[in-house]
Amino acid sequence: LVREAVVTARVTTLKGPDAGAYYVDGPGRYYLDGDEPPGRWLGRGATSLGLVGEVDDDDFLSLMDGRHPATGELLGTSHHERTVRGFDVTCSAPKSVSVLFAIGDDRVRKEVLEAHDAAVAAAFGWIEDHAHCRYRVDGEVWTVDARGLIAAAFRQHTSRAHDPQLHTHLVIPNRVMAPDGRWLALDARTLKHDQRTISALYAAGLRAELTSRLGVRWNDVVNGQAETADAPDEVLDAFSQRTRQMARRLDEKTERFVDNLGRRPTPRERWRIEREAAIDSRPSKTSEDAQALHEHWTDQLDALGYRPDGYIDRVTGRARPIEPDAATAAYFLAAAALT
């Protein structure tokens, strides 16, 4: 089994009038349900509107509809049926980090969550500082630096197959504060273009935080991602049901492509097939009791011959001294500049 390790942050465009409702009323309701924490507001744009702390459903829906959450007034121009309502920047931890959280004791789980949240905040801070908004004058599109973004951060700790998968959805409504106080549309070209940079910032931040907090050491970085050193492949594979589902669907669709066209897909065609396989194999997300999941995951680990305490000692190296490195120092300097 080859686990997907291409990017740790993905940018998805959210379109249509139901884009916001998906997260709070529809299939995505699980973002605010069950044992997951409530969403939280991020960004200077959110602060300017008085949005601090937990995400309120009505405020979120108003913003995704391009309206002021308190007054209902339009922020900029009105949306239409095909208008881009926002963007979902999803920051996902490597599988080994998710497993460490899944089977860890209270202290380890707390440190992993705080490390993840800090890395997400640093990545979002970079997005906000480099964001642009766009406007049209006499048919010509102009861009200007943005003064502040709004983001609703929804953190989750499972995949749709109930594997441990720590990740955060940064849902950014398509309304950006311009330097003159107007609310304009986000220039998505820069957001999409910088996806790999955002990925690298989150991943490097997570590694630095976990090394500092728990003494975690890392394998070599491959495609922008690294697993924790000493994490057995058999353990990571056992907690990767979603990856297996996608791999089976990808094989089926690739075989059908070859049968129909008599050739292998080009890189661009394969990228499209991979996206289709991910969507086709995606089960509905349901809530599960956190304690029940934790017990299930520790039972899985035990069946593989590993005890949680021994596994944590093996992966975190908490009995070994932490050795600061240049990457860790550079991350903390960058994070400090964002606060």
Place the predicted regions along the sequence by residue.
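Intrinsically disordered, flexible peripheral segments
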Residues: L1-L338
